[in-house]
């Protein structure tokens, strides 16, 4: 299975992080490697892919904390594995609690505070981005764990690039002056950049932010894309976990 390992966390022995793709030799189906039970894929195969992915990142499948994402801007502090409703971001300072994000175009963001030892995982689509969910996650890490943003290492993962993020006027209005006029009469938003700006405004250092250049819509061999493939699109997972 092809797994993306963020460079920003490489060399740090007590944190593990990764993101799945749709490539792997287990996938002899059209959908490719998929980690969601809710898109019509064979549950046995999804389970096998699920275990393989987390094993490859070095995380136990019993340690997962999974937000049941709803395009909110709610950030939840968790101390145990499990499923969590009504939220799109989790933070923890507990080892062996692996924070999971589920995506297919939306932006997965992973945060690590190596000084006060805390992590965060955020799902930011355009609604979450407008709702400043990344800003709220950093604020909650500051409040709960005394995190200094200057120390945070951040990963902004593969997601819809500005190249493919054309929006209608109703979304553009909500983004205000943040829209990117790309072609005449078309309006584009740049979610990776918006979330990067939220981190910078919170005091995270530019050198401490790794931004994936991959576009999930353009790179169809490697990534699932809801916008490209619709309801039956597979899903990818990103995860971060502190170890002993
Ligand atoms: Zn693209």
Each language-model region and where it sits:
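Active-site microenvironment for binding and transforming phosphate-containing groups
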Residues: 1-244
């Amino acid at each position: 299975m092809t797994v993306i390992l963020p460079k920003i966390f490489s060399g740090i022995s007590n944190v593990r992080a990764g993101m799945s793709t749709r490539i792997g030799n287990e996938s002899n189906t059209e959908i490719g490697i998929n980690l969601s039970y809710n898109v019509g894929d064979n549950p046995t195969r999804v389970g096998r892919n699920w275990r393989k992915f987390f094993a490859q990142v070095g995380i136990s499948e019993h340690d997962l904390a999974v937000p049941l994402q709803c395009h909110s801007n709610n950030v939840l502090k968790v101390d145990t594995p499990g499923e969590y409703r009504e939220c799109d971001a989790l933070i923890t300072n507990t080892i062996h609690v692996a924070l999971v994000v589920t995506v297919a175009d939306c932006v997965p963001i992973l945060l690590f505070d190596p000084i006060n030892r805390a992590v965060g995982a955020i799902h930011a689509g355009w609604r979450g981005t407008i709702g400043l969910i990344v800003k709220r996650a950093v604020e909650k890490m500051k409040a709960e764990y005394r995190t200094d943003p200057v120390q945070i290492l951040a990963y902004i993962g593969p997601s819809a690039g500005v190249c493919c993020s054309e929006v209608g006027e109703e979304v553009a209005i909500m983004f205000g002056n943040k829209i990117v006029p790309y072609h005449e009469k078309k309006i584009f938003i740049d979610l990776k950049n918006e979330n990067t700006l939220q981190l910078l405004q919170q005091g995270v250092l530019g050198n401490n932010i790794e931004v994936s250049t991959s576009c999930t819509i353009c790179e169809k061999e490697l990534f699932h894309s809801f916008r490209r493939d619709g309801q039956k699109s597979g899903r990818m997972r990103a995860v971060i976990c502190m170890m002993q």
